[in-house]
Amino acid sequence: DLCIFMDESHHYHADKSFDVINELRPIMGVELTATPQIQKGSRKIPFKNVVYEYSLAHALNDEKYVKVPVVFTRKDFRPEEYTPEQLDHEKLNDGLRLHEDTKSRLEVYARTFGRPVVKPFVLVVARDTDHSKEIMKYIKSNDFFNGYYADKVMEINSAQRGAEKDENIEQLLSLENPDNKIEVVIHVNMLKEGWDVTNIYTIVPLRASASETLTEQTIGRGLRLPYGERTGVDEVDRLSIVSHDKY
């Protein structure tokens, strides 16, 4: 008898996927997902036969297991007065200022309470590969914090191959290590799931999210707590998200 456990099971709901699974003739299928819904265009179709659900809303209400997501914007901000490139630059500047403040707060907390120092990093969501390269160029330039992040930024996308891809994967897997110098990760729809780190503290979305599922997956990257529980210090327990008008 065969029982199939399907992680990230929202991927299995296409007709061809079901055909393959049914050919195996399992007696039971158990699905695991943080986003129990199928997005079809603008429609969101919830899963049926849900045995147990623990939603982000429940986790936030329990005030124990995840960071508190907080959206940061500017008062009286008029995006129509900026070009798309200028808007990206403003959001990146706001995001990195939040990052520097968070980095200081984490260090103060660790030294005050004798805990390991957590090295935070920023996740930047780009529209496509060309956009990602433009962001990378800007962050490495002297126009961005006088070039401070030139050797502290990495880009991950599906076009990377060979040694470059291997090096980036190695960097991603060691981002929680204080010796890893990377503080900014730019990605194009590559890290929405299956990548678990606890030290994402700032997310800068520079693309409109295509679906509610994608939004939840992206934010979900940053909700894990580095100390395994909330500390009671707002800045240590917070995930900062720089506002996007369509995110």
Residue spans of the language-model regions?
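Walker B catalytic acidic pair
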Residues: 7-8, 190
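Short glycine-/polar-rich loops that comprise or flank the Walker A/P-loop
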Residues: 25-28, 62-68, 150-151, 198-201, ...
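Conserved ATPase-coupling elements of RecA-like P-loop NTPase cores
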Residues: 9-19, 195-198
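Post-DEXD/H (motif II) to motif III coupling segment of the RecA-like Helicase ATP-binding lobe
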Residues: 14-68
